[in-house]
């Protein structure tokens, strides 16, 4: 009943769907640290705001689980306050961008109630289903272009590492347009082609722009392979990172983005910038972009 109520209300509140997934945000940038203030990029912060700020993604995870309080104090696992349900409910709102969710308190509150219920849900670094979106500038055949890299955390021996999962690059997408089904059906090799020593195979190469129409219906272009190929050939040259954000699917029936907010406020740093109720059965197709 509680989950049905959340689903019904969140459908009314959220308004949009998943179109904001690839919207870019500011890159995390640290400055110097004076005694009573710190410069975060171009923003001077007072000491109180600096402590309240969620400065690292690891800190976001600890605060989300209430393994660290809003003042930056880590909580001992043996302490009764560790992952305390009530304290977690009271403090979790600091992890939302309140300039956005201050105007949508219902959705924020339903999320907090859901993740702090008796079957509480926590984030874990090695729990899978959370990804980093790194927007970067490259030179492609001498011209500056934007490219998005999707990274995930992978276990490595006793530790872990970030690995490239997927690439979004408009130039690659142009190579494999979706195409009209009727048009695709015009491009095929006759089932008796083998009896003619595949003399008609030239058809595949006559129109190279649609050569993939002759592949199996299960064919999916691998953009990560194209990415590595272009790098190895020297056609694609890295310049710099422009922005970073995170996409979190770990929480049952929810998706949220975590973006960097650079401002002199206690509500700053890594914060939830987009929250959507998504039943688990609907996540499967979305996750194909993050783990093809």
Residue ranges of predicted features:
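Bacterial Sec-dependent N-terminal signal peptides
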Residues: 1-51
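Intrinsically disordered, low-complexity segments enriched in polar/charged residues with Gly/Pro
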Residues: 14, 123-124, 136-139, 233-235, ...
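Core segments of small alpha/beta cavity-forming domains
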Residues: 39-107, 175, 182-231
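Long, acidic/polar, low-complexity amphipathic helices and coiled-coil-like
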Residues: 45-66, 125-178
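Short N-terminal edge-element motif at the start of the domain
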Residues: 74-159
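Short, exposed beta-strand/loop patches in secreted or surface proteins that constitute
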Residues: 123-125, 237-239, 261
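Short beta-strand edge/turn micro-motifs at domain boundaries
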Residues: 144-203, 209, 242-292
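Long terminal regulatory regions of eukaryotic proteins
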Residues: 225-241, 245-250
């Amino acid at each position: 009943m509680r989950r049905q109520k959340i689903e019904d209300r969140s459908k009314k509140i959220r308004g949009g769907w998943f179109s904001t997934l690839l919207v870019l945000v500011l890159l995390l940038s640290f400055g110097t640290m004076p005694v009573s203030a710190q410069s975060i990029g171009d923003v001077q912060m007072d000491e109180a705001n600096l402590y309240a700020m969620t400065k690292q993604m690891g800190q976001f995870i600890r605060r989300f689980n209430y393994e660290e309080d809003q003042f930056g104090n880590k909580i001992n696992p043996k302490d009764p306050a560790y992952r305390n349900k009530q304290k977690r409910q009271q403090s979790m709102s600091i992890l939302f961008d309140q300039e956005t969710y201050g105007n949508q308190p219902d959705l924020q509150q339903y999320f907090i109630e859901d993740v702090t219920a008796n079957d509480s849900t926590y984030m874990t670094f090695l729990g899978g289903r959370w990804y980093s979106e790194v927007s970067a500038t490259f030179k492609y055949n001498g011209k500056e272009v934007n490219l998005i890299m999707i990274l995930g955390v992978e276990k490595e021996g006793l530790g872990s590492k970030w690995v490239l999962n997927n690439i979004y690059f408009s130039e690659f997408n142009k190579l494999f347009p979706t195409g009209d089904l009727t048009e695709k059906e015009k491009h095929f090799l006759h089932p008796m082609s083998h009896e003619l020593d595949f003399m008609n195979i030239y058809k595949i190469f006559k129109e190279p722009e649609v050569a993939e129409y002759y592949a199996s219906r299960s064919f999916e272009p691998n953009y990560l392979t194209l990415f590595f190929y272009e790098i190895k050939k020297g056609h694609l040259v890295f310049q710099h990172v422009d922005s970073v954000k995170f996409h979190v699917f770990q929480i049952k029936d929810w998706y949220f983005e975590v973006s960097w907010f650079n401002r002199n406020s206690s509500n700053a740093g890594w914060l939830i910038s987009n929250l959507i109720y998504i039943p688990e059965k609907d996540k499967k197709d979305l996750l194909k972009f993050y783990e093809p």
